[in-house]
UniProtKB/Swiss-Prot annotation:
CDD domains: PT_UbiA_DGGGPS. Its cofactor is Mg(2+). The chain crosses the membrane at residues 7-27, 32-52, 72-91, 95-117, 128-148, 193-213, 214-234, 258-278. Pathway: Membrane lipid metabolism; glycerophospholipid metabolism. It is a multi-pass membrane protein. The keyword Metal-binding does not apply. It comes from Methanothermobacter thermautotrophicus (strain ATCC 29096 / DSM 1053 / JCM 10044 / NBRC 100330 / Delta H) (Methanobacterium thermoautotrophicum). This is Digeranylgeranylglyceryl phosphate synthase. One of its GO terms (biological process) is glycerophospholipid biosynthetic process. Prenyltransferase that catalyzes the transfer of the geranylgeranyl moiety of geranylgeranyl diphosphate (GGPP) to the C2 hydroxyl of (S)-3-O-geranylgeranylglyceryl phosphate (GGGP). This reaction is the second ether-bond-formation step in the biosynthesis of archaeal membrane lipids.
Length: 281
């Protein structure tokens, strides 16, 4: 893959774009603003990934030596300029959508830079920041499409799921993080406590997620797919409680990603647009 595309982590960026598309399904709006908001989210997320790799070049040499900067396919200086250009483009497009969307993009961009520079290595603070930004993608879509209430609730669940995965990823990367002098949760409080906290976030998300149906945000079509996601999260929670070694953490991290994907599919299935198309409720 071209290193300038790879460093964006396009799969993660597309996952962020899906939040906007899900809000479009909920509102039933599919116009230029949806397309532009999707491009904004992809660009800003990609920029955040680039600046993250810029500041993480030393630790990635241990944990992720195949990434573009530690592998030498992109210089650190070029990556820094690349991220600035991407952040600027995302901000300009955000202001084209409106003052509030533009301010959200600018503030998110600044937070992503500060996260990569200072917050990432701090116990839980970095995890909370990236989880907040993930949930904010839903809220951004809700602001653009005029459905803020639902977007906040969906963003909350995205926050819970992301918190679980971020903690598990820290467990997976504990060796390199310790060598870099980071103070992530597994380093400061141990792997066992980290596993318990990650499992707790998965359990909270699993047990409360049916409320989105009860509140009338989604139709009954939401429930069957949601149950699959809950099964994945519960299995992942049990696994991380039973073992906290790197291999288990790596597997659980992948399972959480699958669970998040299934949750997003459940959001889509229960949306007003899909319900109207199927004639089911």
């Amino acid at each position: 893959m071209n290193p300038y595309i790879e460093i964006l982590r396009p799969v993660n960026a597309v996952m962020a774009v899906i939040t906007v598309m899900l809000m479009a399904l909920i509102t039933g709006r599919f116009d230029f603003s949806v397309l532009l908001a999707s491009v904004v989210v992809f660009t800003a997320t990609g920029a955040g990934n680039v600046i993250n790799d810029y500041f993480d070049h030393e630790i990635d040499a241990i944990n992720r030596p195949e990434r573009p900067i530690p592998s030498g396919r992109i210089s650190r200086g070029v990556a820094g300029v690349y991220s600035i250009i991407l952040f600027a483009l995302a901000s300009l497009m955000g202001f084209y959508l409106g003052l509030l969307p533009g301010l959200v993009v600018v503030s998110s961009s600044l937070l992503m830079v500060y996260y990569a520079w200072r917050l990432k290595k701090r116990c839980l603070v970095g995890n909370i920041t990236i989880s907040f930004l993930t949930g904010l993608s839903f809220v951004f879509g809700g602001i653009v499409l005029g459905e803020v209430r639902a977007s906040i609730l969906l963003g909350f669940y995205a926050f819970l799921m992301t918190m679980a995965r971020e903690i598990v990823k820290d467990m997976e990367d504990v060796e390199g993080d310790r060598a870099e002098g980071a103070t992530t949760l597994p380093i400061t409080h141990g792997m066992r406590i980290s596993g318990v906290l990650a499992a707790s976030f998965m359990l909270i998300a699993s047990l409360t997620s049916p409320s989105l149906y009860l509140l009338g945000i989604f139709s009954a079509l939401y429930i069957p797919v949601l149950l699959l996601a809950v099964a994945v999260f519960l299995r992942a929670a049990i696994m991380i409680l039973r073992g906290q070694d790197r291999a288990t953490a790596s597997r659980v991290s992948r399972m959480i990603k699958v669970g998040m994907a299934l949750t997003f599919i459940a959001f889509a299935a229960g949306s007003g647009t899909i319900t109207a198309l199927t004639g089911l409720s």
